[in-house]
Amino acid sequence: MQTFAEIAALREQIKQFKRDGRTVAFVPTMGNLHEGHLTLVKKARELADIVVVSIFVNPMQFDRADDLNNYPRTLEADLNKLTGEGVELVFTPTPEVMYPDGLDKQTFVEVPGISHMLEGASRPGHFRGVSTIVTKLFNIVQPDFACFGEKDFQQLAVIRQMTTDLALDIEVVGVATVREMDGLAMSSRNSNLTIDERQRAPVLARTMRWISSAIRGGRDDYASVIEDATDQLRAADLQPDEIFICDVKTLQAITSESTQAVILMSAFLGKTRLIDNQVLDLVSETKEEVKEETAE
């Protein structure tokens, strides 16, 4: 496994692989790797001849200085894990390499609409930071495939839209969320939880499943469902951040035409922000029967 901290050297090695006719799959990360990240790496291995992983804690996408400063950094352990997965190339740039003139003078990429709704409304600039760094990394690595976790649902939607809008010749591949045995979605931030917080953390996933069951059971009073879910989180001493129930394709309010919904949730445990999501079908057997009767 080769590790690069500079752009030019990484580019040259990738060009050599491509001259040899090899395909490249890319997994961008912020480090503190867990089994969820390694699942992305395994998927990348299935897709291409060469796997490139980046480890970069991107300051542009953080809206709170304390969150940036507290983000776990475990480079040595990360490199050991990637070696075990047989990764060919790892890119570990510094902020000075990625933003040589500083953030204030950095050209940015921003996907209109979707970047400013839902999570983007409460975290201004977050998705701009994501779009900018992913565009730069795509430009550096020039992958055939790029793998992202579906846990960051809106982020994945932003990246897919950006890739389409900019006509990038890259296949963006979403990979299902990997969970702990108790249902908690794996996240680098989980390592910041205290023992007590870690015991309470699965409440987020349980509440999400409750929302899903309520909707499948026929509840379409979504505002009321969200209120009930908020109460459940508070009862477990989680601080609700955001809960959205929206159309899976548009991320807008559910309409009579919606066939699938996505539940997007976030909550704080102490200083740690946890996120999760679940996609569910809205077309019930009753609705299907009505459609069949109408067709007759």
Swiss-Prot record:
It comes from Vibrio atlanticus (strain LGP32) (Vibrio splendidus (strain Mel32)). Belongs to the pantothenate synthetase family. The keyword Transport does not apply. GO terms for biological process: pantothenate biosynthetic process. Its EC number is 6.3.2.1. It holds the Pfam family Pantoate_ligase. InterPro entries: Cyt_trans-like, Pantoate_ligase, Pantoate_ligase_C, Rossmann-like_a/b/a_fold. This is Pantothenate synthetase. SUPFAM superfamilies: Nucleotidylyl transferase. It is found in: Cytoplasm.
